[in-house]
Swiss-Prot record:
This is Pyridoxine/pyridoxamine 5'-phosphate oxidase. Pathway: Cofactor metabolism; pyridoxal 5'-phosphate salvage; pyridoxal 5'-phosphate from pyridoxamine 5'-phosphate: step 1/1; Cofactor metabolism; pyridoxal 5'-phosphate salvage; pyridoxal 5'-phosphate from pyridoxine 5'-phosphate: step 1/1. The gene is pdxH. Keywords: Flavoprotein, FMN, Oxidoreductase, Pyridoxine biosynthesis. Its cofactor is FMN.
Length: 217
């Protein structure tokens, strides 16, 4: 793109000096280490520490990625919510395999979950939906996610219309809005290290236990 060498991405580099990750730092259950790192990301005041890159694949094998917010996690899996007509929801209906990446750049860390996504029950979705701010609930009605629109004004007009409609009482749950639980069987932790000698550990589920291996950077 540039011939005068004013900007070359190959020259953008830095050392990773925030410390390493040793086997003695690991927990038996990867979710415990994930929770520790997530809390540290929050304490470090990282912007959107629960933001994760969600990767899905369409029927042609074309991968897609987008940023989504984590809303719950436990031993059963990681939970996020979305419009069920969205591209990611449609792709997960065809192929439930999914990857989640948490990029905590300021801490030189990332965590990758691999697994399968399954739809949440209506009761679970309803409980979360009504915990959201009312304007966010209305916003769920406004957006037919991933559909083509002529202008932003279309969304804003629809929002004002529905805000008036739902001014009194509760906002009902849209039939096209739901959530997914990612049941993971692989978790990789990456910690940046000096001289590009990064630390990587992968947890892989084996029956009722987790097998842990160190990976070359």
């Amino acid at each position: 793109m540039t011939e005068n060498n004013e900007f070359d991405v190959a020259d953008l580099r830095r050392e990773y000096i925030r410390g390493g990750l040793r086997r003695s730092d690991l927990t038996e259950n990867p979710l415990e280490l994930f929770e520790r790192w997530l809390k540290q990301a929050c304490e470090a005041r990282l912007p959107d520490p629960t933001a994760m890159c969600v990767a899905t694949v369409d029927t042609n094998g074309q991968p897609y990625q987008r940023i989504v917010l984590l809303k719950h996690y436990d031993d059963q899996g990681l939970v996020f919510y979305t419009n069920l007509g969205s591209r990611k929801a449609q792709q997960l209906a065809e192929n439930p395999h999914i990857s989640l990446l948490f990029p905590w750049h300021m801490l030189d860390r990332q965590v990758i979950f691999l697994g399968k996504a399954e739809r949440l029950s209506t009761l679970e979705v309803l409980k979360y939906f009504h915990s959201r701010p009312k304007d966010s609930q209305i916003g769920a009605w406004v957006s037919q996610q991933s559909s083509r629109i002529s202008a932003r004004g279309v969304l804003e007009s629809k929002f004002l219309e529905l805000k008036q409609k739902f001014q009194q009482g509760d906002v009902p749950l849209p039939s096209f809005w739901g959530g997914f639980r990612v049941k993971f069987d692989s978790v990789e932790f990456w910690q940046g290290g000096e001289h590009r000698l990064h630390d990587r550990f992968i947890y892989q589920r084996e029956a009722d236990a987790w097998k842990i291996d160190r990976l070359a950077p």
